[in-house]
């Protein structure tokens, strides 16, 4: 999959990332390099290799699940830029 400046522009717009026009082509080249690397990884034979979730074999301490009444919605949303009725209000990002 080749990534061009138009694709970078579209992805940047969807991600709400301001990207100057003079950076689109270098970013496209960089993303194409990343995609090439991913394609190389996809060609690696991993048959018989056990999947890992971590390279460190250490367990996490478990705690008892306890039902609580939850937090105070006003306290939780106090630092939010915008909230309504105890819910966070965020801008629509999917078109």
UniProtKB/Swiss-Prot annotation:
Gene3D superfamilies in alphabetical order: Glu-tRNAGln amidotransferase C subunit, N-terminal domain (1.10.20.60)
Enzyme Commission identifier(s): 6.3.5.-
Keyword Ligase assigned: yes
Example GO biological process: glutaminyl-tRNAGln biosynthesis via transamidation
Membership in a protein family: Belongs to the GatC family.
Stored HAMAP family: GatC
Subunit note: Heterotrimer of A, B and C subunits.
Name used for this protein in its record: Aspartyl/glutamyl-tRNA(Asn/Gln) amidotransferase subunit C
